[in-house]
Amino acid sequence: NLRSVEDRIAPVKELFRLQGASELQEAEERYLPKRQARSRALILAASRGSALGELTEHRPKTMVKIRGRPLLSHIVSAYNAAGIKRINVVRGYLPEAIDLPAISYADNADYADTSELLSLACGLGSDADDSMDLYVSYGDVIFKRYILDALAETDDDFAIVVDTEW
């Protein structure tokens, strides 16, 4: 199945580079729709992740390292790879520990006593722009770019991706 090989699949951009086909890469960039011009992301990352114990004693769950990088860095990379550069992160527990470049932040000071819904409201309130598509994700769920590509293909006003094996 795809899951067993997806980490070994090279993006088309890399194939163009390896083949020295810069004209094809330029054509792809010129003619494919520019998702970043009409999309933004909101990442809900306010929780501590207390179930992780000492691992999150001095850092939020979203800053726990996976393969040498914080969870949040992997998520931001997936958005960037899909052309989504406008990213807003809702912080809560130890907000100063979440400080990645080129993203904006909203803080949920009541994160410990509220749910993700208030974090969503905080994020939406700090970056309101109804003219852009909005992708919302959790700060502790890593996903691949193809998930965003699949969402972008839908004509529906509202779509949710669910991991049926979780």
Please state what every model-predicted region is.
Residues 54:
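Canonical Radical SAM [4Fe-4S] cluster-binding loop centered on the CxxxCxxC motif
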Residues 24-25, 95-96, 144-146:
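Short, well-ordered alpha-helical microsegments
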Residues 48:
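Conserved SAM/SAH-binding loop
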Residues 146-166:
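Conserved donor-nucleotide/metal-binding helix-loop-beta segment in metal-dependent transferases, i.e.
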Residues 57-61:
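Short alpha-helical oligomerization interface
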Residues 20:
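Short, conserved phosphate/pyrophosphate- and ester-handling motifs at nucleotide-, phospho-/glycolipid
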Residues 139-141:
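The conserved acidic donor/metal-binding loop of glycosyltransferases
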